[in-house]
Amino acid sequence: MLMPKRTKFRKQMKGRNRGYATRGASLATGEFALKAVEAGRVNSRQIEAARQALTRHVKRQAKIWIRVFPDKPLTKKPLQTRMGKGKAGVEEWVMNIKPGRIIFEMAGVDEELAREALTLALHKLPFKSKFVTRESENEIY
């Protein structure tokens, strides 16, 4: 699972996930990509499930880049616990995703196979996303 090796602080505040992505919003190395259309939060299990779906469909022919990393700790109190007694322990690691953020990139296969594989991967993610190419990446969400 993806998670930081060490952090300066164990827990973080929730924060807000507003606006559009400015960083990570354009293709860096690949020819095809999966771009977020709406805001959401992705955890390490969802990233791994999508990555496995991608690699199995392309049968390891393509080069795949994961452009997101869950570095925000999410805490959760156990069931049937009364309020108070401090902030709960870290349950999982997540990353806030803004619209326009590139999630996965892919190169080395034709567009049809890449579209099929990335469509399989987008069904594993908890927010709407779309397939983009180098030519179509600058379109409005």
From Swiss-Prot:
Pfam families: Ribosomal_L16. One of its GO terms (cellular component) is cytosolic large ribosomal subunit. The keyword Ribosomal protein applies. InterPro entries: Ribosomal_uL16, Ribosomal_uL16_bact-type, Ribosomal_uL16_CS, Ribosomal_uL16_dom, Ribosomal_uL16_sf. It comes from the Bacteria. GO terms for molecular function: rRNA binding; structural constituent of ribosome; tRNA binding. One of its GO terms (biological process) is translation. The keyword Ribosomal protein applies. CDD domains: Ribosomal_L16_L10e. Keywords: Ribonucleoprotein, Ribosomal protein, RNA-binding, rRNA-binding, tRNA-binding. Binds 23S rRNA and is also seen to make contacts with the A and possibly P site tRNAs. Part of the 50S ribosomal subunit. Belongs to the universal ribosomal protein uL16 family. This is Large ribosomal subunit protein uL16. It comes from Campylobacter concisus (strain 13826).
